A protein has these predicted regions:
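Active-site core of metal-dependent hydrolases
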Residues: 4-17, 26-135
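His/Asp/Glu-enriched, well-ordered alpha-helical/loop segment
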Residues: 62, 83-94, 121, 137-170
Length: 170
């Protein structure tokens, strides 16, 4: 079991988040978590990603973020995360969840992002049971990117049938 210090309501749009995240990591949280796509602007999303990696480097922690989790092909937080992981030399220490917008990416952009994921040694966790859009698992595998399945929701509003059974997801 790992404890994730998670920015539930955004970094920029929720004042005081930085202090809460520091406190959680000082208390021993194992992973730094973010959700940059819920910020209001592209600049705020980029700052969110940067701040999460700043904490990861400061505390020597892995990163786990919910990215591009909406049906909007214009979302770019998965790319931002991969680039940041590469620039910080955080290879193999970053995990991206959902990436539902990937289902709508044009193929050239998808291939660009897949190459970045591979370079960053980043894994994408797809949760296909919680909505009609999901990460392009087969295409990611064909591009040589790392993918796994997850169960994000257990008996909640998003998926009230979740029972923490990975066979349901498979």
């Amino acid at each position: 079991i790992q404890v994730v210090a998670f920015v539930q309501d955004g970094w920029v749009r929720e004042p005081g988040t930085d202090k809460l995240m520091h406190e959680a990591l000082e208390l021993g949280a194992d992973v730094v978590g973010g959700i940059p796509w819920i910020e209001y602007t592209d600049a705020d999303m980029k700052q969110h990603v940067k701040e999460i990696f700043d904490l990861a480097v400061e505390f020597d922690k892995d990163v786990s973020m919910l990215v591009d989790d909406a049906g909007d092909a214009g979302l770019r937080t998965l790319e931002l995360m991969a680039v940041e992981a590469i620039q910080r030399n955080w290879h193999g220490r970053a995990l991206a969840h959902h990436a539902r917008a990937m289902a709508l990416y044009p193929m050239p952009y998808f291939q660009k992002v897949a190459a970045l994921l591979k370079q960053a040694n980043m894994t994408v966790v797809s949760d296909p049971h919680t909505g009609p859009l999901h990460a392009r698992v087969k295409d990611l595998l064909a591009e040589g990117a790392s993918v796994c399945l997850g169960q994000d929701d257990i008996s909640d509003a998003y998926y009230p049938f979740g029972r923490n059974n990975m066979l349901e997801v498979a």
